[in-house]
Amino acid sequence: MTSTNKSISHLPILHNPFLNCLFNNPQYFKSPLKGVVDELQSNHTNFTILVPPAHVLNEYYDPTTESSNSKTLLKELCYNNEDFIRSHIINTASPVSSTITPISKEQSVIYNTLNNKQILIKNRIIYTGKGFRRSLKLKTLSIQYFSSFCDYFPKRSKFMIIYIESTLFGGIPPRKMLPPLPEVRETNKTDKDIDSVTFEKLLRSFPLLSKAVSDKFYRLFHHNNYQFRVLRYKNRKKLSHIKLEFQKILQEAFSIISDSVNVDNPNSEQTYNLINHIISMYPGIDLNKLVHEYVELNLYDVLWSQLIFQFNCPNDDKEAYDPEAILILTKEKYEKLSCLSLNQLDIPVNKPWLMNELHERISLGVQEFEKLADSSIMNSAAKTQVVYSTFRILTQRKNGNIDPVINADTLIGLLIMVMVHSKIENIEAHIYYIKHFNSIDNTNDGQFNYIMSNLDAVLFHFSKKESGYLDLIENSKKNYEIWNAIKNNDLEKVESIIELVNNEYPETELPENHFLKSKNINGESCLMFAIKTKRYEIYDCLINSNPNWIPIDSILFEKNVMTNQNLLMCALIEETDYKIIDDLVDIILNNATLEEQTMYFNMTDISGRSVGHYLFHNYKLISKIGHLIDWEKKDNNSHTPLFSLCRCYDHPEYVELIRAGFNCVYKKYGETGVDYDKHVDKSGNTLLHVLLKGIPESKMLSNSNNLVNVNQLNQRCLSPLMVYVKYNRLENLKEILHDSRLDFLGEDFKNYYNVFDYLSFSALKSTKSENFQNIENAVFNYYLQNYFPRHATENVAALNAKYDGGKKDWLIFFKNGDGFCNYKSLRNIKQILYLIKLKQPLSTFPSEESFWKNYGFGISTSPMFHKVRINRLIDDFNLLFEGLTFQESINQSEFFKTFLTEYTKETSIFESKQRIGEQLDFDKQSLGEVTYKLNQIQEIEYFLEYSLNNFQKYAYLFARLAKLVCIGDSKQVDCRNVLDTIMYRFNKTTVFDDIFTYSEVNNQAGTLGVAREYFYWIQMHGDELLHSIQKLVSDINSWKQMYYSICHINSELKLMEPHNTVSQESQDNSNGQELLSRRDSSLSINPIPEEELEDDNLGFLSNFVGTSKKARYKKLVVEKSEIVKNIMKLNLEIKWSHELIAAEISDFLKFRTEFLRFGIKRYISEEIKSLKQRSTELSKYVFLVRKDK
């Protein structure tokens, strides 16, 4: 433990105070952190840490101090408040409860924190629960592993952390948020509530009212009600009689209501109070209007059928019998007027842009007026509303539009067009119904009377009393002839008509009301019809017969007013004759000004698309008009013209289309550069995402000036690489794999899928496809070339994993360069690694405890953690495979095959351990009888002590280096996050945003993390080797203890032998050779017959020792014999271990150099990618700053 008297120092401070408090705290042994550290030390895989963003902790205040004069920053709580720390650490190994919704399959899990509070995690949202003062709902930003570099947590331990958008205690921002804008209350809300009330609803809502009047209304509306039989009989009668009968019924209905509150009625008082209550509930309600509409509702079918019957009677004597019932607009008249054009109605408007506005109003007015024929319109109020809306469309200006003057003549002309083209049967009956069956008395309503008078005027215009009616029919006939000839591709007919016109107007302009200038209600002229017909001869006959007939303004301003598509757009969409398109473009380029050309080619339709969005229909136009196109203009789907070109997947000349489009864009924006961020759609797709093929032709990756992020994720968290694999775009895949900026193993921040996951998804659909196999080979070969040692003759890689619900275990997918692949469950893999270590107990192969240190085997956890954990475990598997290619102690070929083959017969672990133990014993026995002298053991001991000291020094220095690399990785992340924050806040579009984009959404791992893993792996191998050396040193110490025990026993035995034997022995020893036995070995002993030891009267011992000495001698001999057996076994063990360790040391010295070199190469490669990525981001920033100047 660190002494409190010494000056305390620690590594560079982490930017996130919470992480710094837990992992870089020199006061970890003091409160409030001591208890937390003790619990995390015990089993760190059981816990997950919830980490708020750094800027929240550094800038926000504790909510409990909101009303205090001295507010406390949240970062202070990280160091001084144990409750705060414990509240952000959850025990994910033992959830309180876990439920899964049956339909969405979302899992909701409740966890306890270290201080027994509770949180709920559902759909990546964290909800505070029991124990928390405030109920909060926080989004999870990302899930990561944090590598601990401190000394008070287990070495090489990794902690799972979840970045959340704020603390579980909340936080007060440094500046007050602006209050939300007050909601604009609808002033007519009460009116809308009243309008929604009907008498029928009141009857359903108030049973007392229904009881008072429903029976009487039922009898009133019954078909057997003889009192009002006139409406039931379909015979000829005047419309005034129908109106009179309706008024009688209406008065009867009013009487029913008044009788219900009559004093003679026993329930009158209750009914009266109820009606007053209803009036108080809906202030301003008109009960008379409700009753009127109720009567209409019940009698509408009868009334309407009577009106239709009367209007459809022959008009022979109606002039005298009932002039109101004359039917004017019959089906025949509608047919004769069906091709009537607005320009033939003598309105005082002739400018093409104003005519477009009027045509749009007419088209919208027709759509609205047609609602009169809808079967749902069943009362006078609804019919009146339709008429009002139609007049509003025809007369009121829309925002941003040019406002033509709508005088009386213009309005009549618009109404004529609306009534003729809406073709409503019995329009006269509708107008009569609106006038005479209305629930509101409109006698003094000027607007209503003005509208009705205009409708009457239009009807009068079509009557035989108006001479202009015949002119309208004649104009419609002429329009029909030319339109029909064009649509039917009748060139001869068109030519004959044009010849007649040419004879009449040889060198002059056509009058405004001429049929060649006619348009339908959508604003489409003969020229538009010719373009849609796709016949150049007809088009040429119309536009080139006489240049005076169709001025340039007519071409520039002609469009379909409903789609807002001009002539060129329609020509491209209809894919008309290329000669028509070329001629139309030439006319515009030769006759319009540059400003007019730019406006024309960039005007947008209702989808927000310009001509540029439709150029894929004729991409050769790009060379003509591409320089006039705004390639950055987005449509309603956020697609630019260039984006639309890239999405035209079924184009027969797709590559040429891409080449033409991009070359034009580079030529136009070459000086300032192309801003590729403006070509991103609302789903986050970049041009690289949507491009089907032709990356070389687009020059997006090859042009060094292009600021393209090849790793950008769309809103579905797919990078271009993932898209190419998912949708089998082999050509693009090959190209992007050659880009040095590619983050090949990058994972998305939502599902944590990488390219191999999407490869496996595609494999389920198209495993037999040749294209897919090529994609699979390209991806795997890229991995081997860039992430696996190239010198290796054997290889295997763990690619991805899937969860097997049946086995309730993860299956890891392995594959080698020869194409062999297999799935292995984690349990099976754990057994394989365990048995390998049993077979090679003294090798540097990682032990079970070391390898699975950061993977909580068998620990249940939320699905949102699974993918992150398994991805990091896959990384460890690949490190294992990479490391083995630099080692010789383990048979690589045999080891790799165990992951690629499926055993047909499974063997229990117990049987496998037995066989391995027997094999190890056999290997040791094969060494034969092994004897060691002390000097030999001392030589081995010296070698081991030297190696141990050397490796301990190396381990100490390497551990410090690994720690610095680890902290360097964390500081890399801090620097990146701080720079991201600065760039975000310096951006003019986000500087005033209250909503902050958290840096923690991104992957919180630096490039030094790659080097760290290799340092850790070498460190783990070194620890295994140190452990083996220490074990052998321990065996040698045991051997020496046995050796000295034998020496001691030999000394005692010599003292018990006869004197002359001892003297002789001393004489022999004096010759210069130190022997410990008669066979010149301390491990030898002369066998003594037992009968000599047992018989007191026999043998030389009986002459000078007593019975007690005999027993002790026997005991020493037996003890020596046992020690000799043990030391002989230990000799075998030492020799076997010594040879293995010597080989392992040699192998490790080579391994640590080569593997570290490979790791450094990997780090440098990732660092270069990161620097290029950051360079692109900063260059974009500079580009935008310069562009804004």
UniProtKB/Swiss-Prot annotation:
Domain VPS9: 321-471
GO CC field: early endosome; late endosome; plasma membrane; transport vesicle; tubular endosome
SUPFAM superfamilies per the UniProt record, alphabetical: Ankyrin repeat (SSF48403), VPS9 domain (SSF109993)
Pfam families the record matches: VPS9
Gene3D superfamilies: Ankyrin repeat-containing domain, VPS9 domain
GO molecular function: guanyl-nucleotide exchange factor activity; SNARE binding
Any single GO BP term: early endosome to late endosome transport
Family designation: Belongs to the UPF0507 family.
PANTHER family linked: ANKYRIN REPEAT DOMAIN-CONTAINING PROTEIN 27 (PTHR24170), DOMAIN PROTEIN, PUTATIVE (AFU_ORTHOLOGUE AFUA_1G09870)-RELATED (PTHR24170:SF1)
The protein's name: UPF0507 protein C2_02840C_A
Native source organism of the sequence: Candida albicans (strain SC5314 / ATCC MYA-2876)
